[in-house]
């Protein structure tokens, strides 16, 4: 099915965003693992996998529309130096993705509808808003309420968990 170039271009922009988010989550998850923060490592590694699933969905949609996935204009991730900055950078990126997703959905639901692309983006938007963003906001809220040291202690998990 031949898709509109404007839709394919927007889907490619989203694809780049999902892959950069996956890269950022990948680095952050390994930093958490290195620091012994097992619970954060597991959650952020799960988020990385979600981003790769979103990228897969977008690639499949682009190919279905007879487009070519284009990740040539891929910026680098924004890697934090400590737990709060890492969570904040991840949240900032997710909020930017939400804005982009809403723009693409509005474009696809316009006068010349591309509803399958809109549906794909709506699925990603729902997961991003209700899972990723909410969780990151909760973590930053916990740090503000309980203090960084208490948060880090709770994020470490059991001592035996990190042993391999």
Swiss-Prot record:
This enzyme catalyses:
4 Fe(2+) + O2 + 4 H(+) = 4 Fe(3+) + 2 H2O; Fe(2+)(in) = Fe(2+)(out)
Q: Which domain of life is it from?
A: Bacteria
Entry's Gene Ontology molecular function annotations: ferric iron binding; ferroxidase activity; heme binding
Binding locations of Fe cation 1: 18, 51, 54, 129
The protein's role, per its UniProt record: Iron-storage protein, whose ferroxidase center binds Fe(2+), oxidizes it using dioxygen to Fe(3+), and participates in the subsequent Fe(3+) oxide mineral core formation within the central cavity of the BFR protein shell.
Q: Which family does it belong to?
A: Belongs to the bacterioferritin family.
Gene Ontology terms describing biological process = intracellular iron ion homeostasis; iron ion transport
E.C. numbers: 1.16.3.1
User: What is the protein name given in its UniProt record?
Assistant: Bacterial ferritin
Mention any one GO cellular component term assigned to this protein in its UniProt record: cytosol
- Subunit text: Heterooligomer of 24 subunits, arranged as 12 dimers, that are packed together to form an approximately spherical molecule with a central cavity, in which large amounts of iron can be deposited.
Q: Which InterPro entries match?
A: Bacterioferritin, Ferritin-like, Ferritin-like_diiron, Ferritin-like_SF, Ferritin_DPS_dom
Q: Which residues hold Fe cation 2?
A: 51, 94, 129, 132
Domain Ferritin-like diiron, chain residue ranges per copy: 1-147
Presence of keyword Nucleus = no
Gene3D superfamilies according to UniProt: 1.20.1260.10
What keyword terms does UniProt attach to this protein?
Answer: Ion transport, Iron, Iron storage, Iron transport, Oxidoreductase, Transport
Write the lineage as a comma-separated list: Bacteria, Pseudomonadati, Pseudomonadota, Alphaproteobacteria, Rhodospirillales
Pfam families with a match to the protein in the record: Ferritin
State whether keyword Amino-acid biosynthesis applies.
Answer: no
